[in-house]
């Protein structure tokens, strides 16, 4: 949805895929002039370096917008997640690698091109579980909280180079690969608890990401925009 939102506004997009090559290729087929895809394993720094280099080569220009939205091996099913007594340090390391170390590496690889142009837009994907930890996603939430801190501290470092760094935090989305295991009654309960009586969709989250990359957000950096139908007040 994020890729399609940018393409719908005329942007050129390079999509990183790990296991979902077919999904990425479908988008490329729909926008053959402005979309490309390349393999990316966010757990591997060498893969990140290769992806960053290929992103510049595919359109003969350094990217000026980066969206960090990849997720490593996680299923949004509260009943199946380990509780405090059982969760392991390794599970925390896995999520920190995916949600903190990978965005850090992506930013470091693409920052020089942005700084050279004096313009860059970085959007990290967070979660509303910072404010509303109603399910035991301990490892996921902790890693995303670390990413929020990185968003804020990097906004200070990169601002003088013309680069903004922001975060968009959704709740449970209806529906993504990660939320496909979520029981229907959970979606219903969330919808009932929001002022808008709805569960946020991937398209709605994508529109918020698009805002941070747009001219309307040119004076905004270091911020976390919660997009969850009003369930959590940020």
Regions found by a protein language model. Give the residues of each.
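Canonical Rossmann dinucleotide-binding motif of NAD(H)/NADP(H)-dependent dehydrogenases/reductases
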Residues: 1-14
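A glycine/serine/threonine-rich, flexible loop-to-helix segment
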Residues: 25-27, 80-82, 160, 167-194, ...
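Catalytic loop of short-chain dehydrogenase/reductase
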Residues: 72-76, 83-95, 121-146, 151-160, ...
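A short, exposed helix-loop element centered on a Lys and neighboring polar residues
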Residues: 107-108, 152
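Alpha-helical segment proximal to the catalytic Tyr-Lys
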Residues: 112, 156-157, 218
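Short C-terminal tail/terminal secondary-structure segment
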Residues: 132, 192, 196, 210, ...
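Short, small/polar-rich loop/turn modules that mediate ligand/substrate recognition or access, typified
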Residues: 159, 164, 220-222
């Amino acid at each position: 949805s994020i890729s399609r939102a940018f393409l719908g506004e005329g942007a050129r997009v390079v999509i990183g895929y790990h296991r979902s090559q077919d999904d990425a290729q479908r988008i490329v087929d729909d926008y053959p002039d402005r979309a490309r895809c390349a393999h990316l394993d966010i757990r591997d720094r060498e893969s990140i370096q290769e992806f960053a280099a290929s992103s510049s080569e595919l359109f003969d220009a350094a990217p000026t917008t980066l969206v960090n939205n990849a997720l490593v091996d996680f299923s949004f099913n509260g009943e199946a997640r380990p509780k405090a007594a059982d969760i392991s340090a390794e599970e925390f390391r896995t999520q920190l690698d995916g949600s903190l170390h990978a965005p850090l590496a992506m930013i470091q690889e693409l920052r020089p091109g942005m700084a050279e142009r004096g313009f860059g837009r970085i959007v990290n994907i967070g979660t509303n579980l910072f404010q509303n930890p109603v399910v035991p996603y301990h490892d996921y939430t902790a890693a995303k909280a670390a990413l929020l801190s990185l968003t804020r501290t990097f906004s200070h470092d990169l601002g003088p180079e013309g680069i903004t760094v922001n975060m968009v935090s959704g709740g449970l989305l209806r529906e993504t690969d990660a939320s496909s295991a979520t029981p229907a009654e959970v979606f219903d309960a969330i919808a009932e608890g929001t002022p808008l009586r709805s569960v946020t969709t991937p398209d709605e989250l994508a529109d918020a990401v698009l805002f941070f990359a747009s001219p309307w957000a040119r004076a905004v950096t270091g911020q976390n925009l919660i997009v969850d139908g009003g369930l959590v007040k940020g």
